[in-house]
Amino acid sequence: MLTTSIAGYQKSKHCGYCKQKDGSCSYYMSCDNMRVDHYQELMDRGWRRSGTTYYKPDLPRSCCPHYTIRLKASDFKAKKEQRSAINKLNSYVIGPEYRRKAAMLCPEPRDIKRQKRDHFDVVSAVHKAEYERLAKPVGKKTKDAIQPAHKFEVNLEPDSCTKEKHDVMLRYQTEIHKDPEWRWTEASFERFLCNGLDRKLLKVKGKTMKLGSHHMCYRLDGKLVAVGVLDLLPHAVSSVYLFYDPDYQEWDWGKISAMHEIALVIEKGYEYYYMGYYIHSCTKMRYKGRFEPSYILDPESLEWNLLDDEFRKKLDKRKYVSLSEDQRIQAHEGSDGRNHRSLPNETRSEPSIVEDVTTKKLEPELKGEEIELDSEPSDPDDTEIPDGSLFDYNIPGVLKKGEVEKLNLGTMKLLVRTSLIDLEDLRGWEEWQIDDPGTIKGIVAELIATTGPKLLKDTALALF
């Protein structure tokens, strides 16, 4: 049984991406016992987690709309710059001396060489220089196994908090992102990037799948140089965060880690690779769309659409794009291309949904390592709670009031100290309205509208 606490629909006063004060709107909840299958369901409805805080952005009311992006790993076609990032690291690790000796002691057949040259295999490429997988033929004279120039190891480990990891994280945040040191105490690191989803093993078709939150740790000559924070789900590997030692920033860790994670998806059968949110207006985020073919979750229909040049052109012109909404408008309201989403009369100002962003000055193209990862949710002190019910705001991907009214919300549980109570047994339950956020029924209705009905029977609400 999931135990959730509700923060509700909130508007932030500051954007961590564009630094403007327009901010964005999201629905927030917290859960410290989230199941991997439930989180998979939430991600496919546009949710994301930061520690035990879960949030679903309201894209039309965001200055920088967050689009869920994923890749079917088996279809991945590496681009030149992605291949170069892995090849550069492999060449450094192996070294010229090892390469020369290995070519003499165990030469590759020509057809194998030709196959490798003509076809890039991401799984083989990412493991090529890993020490435990590297061939170590014995020298004819020395009778000793030849060794690479460096010992490179990649291991999937529990997402535990250690001094070694925290030290790397602290240097990364302070030197790369210029954060103040006080912001990333060991407790903060543990809260946001450690002890996430519960870990367990699942056997599927003879394969053992690891599930839950893990750290993919990269070590060079015994030293921890980078850590990828991952959520392993029944049908996906979700990239949560990446941090690395600034002494090794010459390596393109954004591409290197993504290719290792794609290889993990392929090898272990997770099927999809989620890279968090894609923010088209943030140039540092566009590297995510370079892993092709990537798909964007339609905010309205919750279907997946290919992120191709046609889609990018739409995003160049409009911050908010929903192909299903565009099709509906063209079919029923004309083909002027404008988004006629009905918004309520509100006292607060809203960012324009159809704002033309082509006139804005774009940031220069960036090196691969200069990447922007998903920011954490807004500080509660930097938010405000809009008036009215969630159903007044017509949020994409959220159940409408009429849809929620058809659900039996009373079967959901309320956690009171250590006891679970059916909501329908509460005094006043039948009189309460689902569009009244001041009642427990209204709170539950908004929660299920945003999470979807599948979580209804497995969730308990904690109010205190």
Question: How does the language model describe each region?
Answer:
Residues 1-43, 54-56, 60, 64, ...:
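A eukaryotic "domain-start" boundary segment
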Residues 71-76, 294-298:
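Short, structured secondary-structure boundary patches
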Residues 69-71, 197-198, 316-317:
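Short alpha-helix boundary/capping motifs
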Residues 295-343:
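C-terminal domain-closing interface element
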